[in-house]
Regions:
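Short, small-residue-biased leader/transition segments that mark boundaries at the very start
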Residues: 1-8
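N-terminal low-complexity or simple alpha-helical regulatory segments
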Residues: 27, 31-151, 168-172
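Alpha-helical transmembrane segments in multipass membrane proteins, preferentially the mid-helix core
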Residues: 56-59, 120-128, 180-200, 254-256
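Juxtamembrane "helix-exit" motif on the non-cytosolic side of transmembrane helices
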Residues: 63, 91-101, 153-165, 226-235
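Alpha-helical transmembrane segments of multi-pass integral membrane proteins
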Residues: 67-88, 142-143, 168-231, 241-250
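Hydrophobic, helix-length membrane anchors
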Residues: 215-284
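Membrane-proximal linker segments that couple transmembrane helices to downstream signaling/catalytic modules
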Residues: 257-376, 381, 392-395, 402-410
């Protein structure tokens, strides 16, 4: 009987151990289930108010009451609409927890939202470089593409049976989304580079530095956009990364738009001096700008050589805001002829040539007046700002003005 009692005791102990293990496993699963939505909800709780603020601010904040800011306002409002669409997406996730209730519906909503927002984001950015970019044809094209994409996504998610075919179709749609985003981003980059070329050929000041954020944001948007597309299909416990990563991304966008407002008028005036019609703009122009070849200009520059030399002697290049149009009027010549002369003679763009003259002027001042401060030196040499002067000086000389002064005056 004692042996039988020992057997019963062992069975009871084993049963209790199994129950304890099951309880621990169940408890751990409950913790996991509880923790994932809480982190996910916290990330949405953090991002959603910011998104709503950015969206409504972009839509309704005032700009200076000048006609020239009309295009900036339209661009910012389009960006505001995109931000509010994303906010609506976040709200559905936050208040209804759709990802945990119906994953297919969440994927459809995310992909459809991203597709539409890609169009809005690219349109808003390119508008800052090309006021004629948005046309009825382009708007309808993007709307039709969005409807087709959303419809196909719905068919794949809700009508196709789960399996290899559905996964392959989802992968194809994800590739379409990414390619669409990359194509739009490429348009922004082409527009940006075209604008930089225009500024370098026509402006003495480094106007391009004011639109550099467009290039930075676009490359960031490509990485972020592709990441969002991939994170849509990741396990639930990693989704909060997608939400939290949006905070610095959209914060940078907000800061850039606010900062650009300070320089927009100067940039737009630079555009207006050289772009007069829709044909000259950079909308769909994906080729290099037409450059005057040496064969198309007179072989001899005898007439202009003396004029340019005399103008350099007067230190006319230190004038801030100087343009090739103004210089051509001073020298009584035309812009095409002057631009070709600069490229052929100095192997530089107009801006690079003027910058080199200003830097030589600054170095001469440093030699004669080593006590001068950098801010005054930058202004007297014709540079827009102290930082712009230091950047240009360092790029050419390989050291800062302060180090150059010590090395050359000791």
């Amino acid at each position: 009987s004692r042996g039988l009692g020992d057997v019963y005791k062992r069975q009871i102990i084993d049963y209790v151990s199994i129950c304890e293990e099951k309880d621990v496993t169940l408890y751990q699963n409950q913790i996991s289930i509880t923790m994932e939505p809480s982190i996910y909800s916290f990330s949405l709780y953090t991002a959603l108010p910011l998104m709503l603020f950015f969206g409504f601010y972009f839509l309704f904040a005032k700009t200076p009451e000048k006609k020239i800011f009309k295009n900036y306002l339209r661009s910012r409002q389009i960006m505001g609409i995109a931000m509010l669409l994303l906010s609506a997406n976040y709200s559905v996730h936050f208040f209804f927890g759709i990802r945990f209730k119906n994953a297919d519906s969440a994927i459809l909503m995310n992909m459809s939202t991203y597709f539409l927002c890609y169009s809005l984001f690219s349109s808003a950015l390119i508008m800052l470089l090309d006021r004629f970019y948005i046309t009825k044809r382009r708007v309808w094209t993007h709307i039709i593409l969005w409807i087709i994409f959303s419809t196909l996504s719905g068919v794949v998610l809700f009508l196709l049976p789960s399996g290899i075919m559905q996964k392959f179709s989802l992968f194809a749609l994800a590739v379409w989304l990414v390619v669409f985003g990359v194509v739009l981003a490429r348009r922004v980059i082409i527009a940006y580079r075209r604008a930089i070329r225009i500024f370098n050929e026509t402006q003495a000041d480094d106007i391009g530095t004011y639109i550099e954020w467009l290039s930075i944001f676009t490359y960031w948007a490509v990485i972020f956009g592709v990441g969002c597309g991939l994170l849509t299909f990741l396990p639930d416990k990693y989704v909060f990364i997608w939400i939290l990563s949006s905070i610095p991304f959209y914060s940078y966008l907000f800061y850039s738009y606010q900062n650009y407002l300070l320089f927009y008028e100067q940039v737009e005036n630079a555009f207006e001096q050289d772009i007069q019609s829709e044909e000259e703009l950079l909308t769909d122009t994906e080729t290099e700008p037409k450059i005057v070849s040496e064969k198309e200009v007179p072989v001899s520059y005898t007439e202009i050589i003396e004029k340019v030399a005399n103008w350099i002697k007067t230190d006319g290049y230190v004038q801030q805001g100087l343009t090739i149009k103004e210089l051509s009027e001073i020298l009584h010549t035309n812009r095409t002829y002057l631009s070709a002369y600069i490229k052929t003679t100095y192997k530089m763009t107009f801006r690079e040539w003027i910058t080199s003259l200003r830097l030589e002027y600054a170095k001469n001042i440093l030699k004669e007046h080593p006590e001068i401060n950098i801010q005054k030196l930058a202004e007297s040499s014709g540079f827009l700002s102290r930082s712009n002067f230091i950047k240009s000086f360092t790029e050419k000389e390989g050291c800062t003005p302060g180090k150059w002064k010590k090395a050359n005056l000791e």
